[in-house]
């Protein structure tokens, strides 16, 4: 059965969207192609008419997650206290408990690092956030300070997600949030 180019393009985007959410929620390695395609009502073999490999899908899914983050961050960084708004959103309970809807860096970065080859897409996602943070900072070393802030946010969110004790998870977010805000004056 032949499908129109429009249908194929829509299916392609559905696969990317679902993969993006699953990679952020479950991890790249834990997301199998067969269950991914089955969840979309598609066959495993049909995957290869859309992508050459899982690695290609990973890059496209990471780009889609980055695009989603760009939209959210544009709103946050347009507020009166943009860095505070970003820190609050990044270290929110919602972001902690809904990784499939959040920044891809905490969930995907460790696996991307273990792949053995850097990802230009992860560089782009990270650099977009660093620029936005840096643009809110005053004084010296704004580039270095933006790296410290983003690294702290990603690390705190990742730690809060990996502990079993919900009180400790909340403390990690709260203490990090307060510390980052205090350090900014």
Regions found by a protein language model. Give the residues of each.
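Alpha-helical DNA-contacting segments of helix-turn-helix folds
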Residues: 51, 58-65, 72
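Hydrophobic alpha-helical connector segments
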Residues: 60, 71-102
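A secondary-structure capping/hinge motif
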Residues: 55-57, 108, 117
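Helix-turn-helix
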Residues: 14, 18-56
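Hydrophobic alpha-helical segments that form the core
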Residues: 104-106, 141-162, 175-179
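N-terminal intrinsically disordered/low-complexity leader segments
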Residues: 1-10
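Helix-loop "lid/cap" segments that line or gate small-molecule binding pockets
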Residues: 92-95, 105-115
């Amino acid at each position: 059965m032949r499908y129109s180019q429009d249908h194929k393009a829509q299916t392609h985007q559905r696969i990317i969207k679902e993969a993006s959410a699953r990679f952020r929620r479950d991890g790249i390695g834990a997301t199998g192609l067969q269950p991914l395609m089955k969840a979309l009502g598609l066959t495993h073999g049909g995957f290869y008419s859309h992508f050459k490999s899982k690695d290609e899908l990973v890059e496209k899914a990471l780009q889609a997650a980055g695009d989603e983050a760009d939209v959210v961050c544009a709103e946050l960084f347009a507020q009166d206290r943009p860095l505070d708004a970003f820190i609050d959103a990044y270290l929110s309970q919602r972001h902690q408990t809904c990784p499939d809807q959040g920044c891809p860096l905490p969930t995907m970065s460790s696996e991307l690092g273990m792949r053995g080859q850097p990802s230009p897409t992860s560089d782009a996602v990270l650099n977009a956030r660093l620029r936005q943070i840096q643009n809110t900072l005053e004084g010296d070393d704004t580039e270095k300070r933006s790296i410290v802030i983003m690294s702290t946010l990603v690390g705190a969110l990742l730690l809060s997600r990996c502990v079993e004790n919900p009180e400790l998870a909340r403390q990690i977010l709260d203490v990090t949030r307060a510390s980052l805000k205090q350090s900014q004056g």
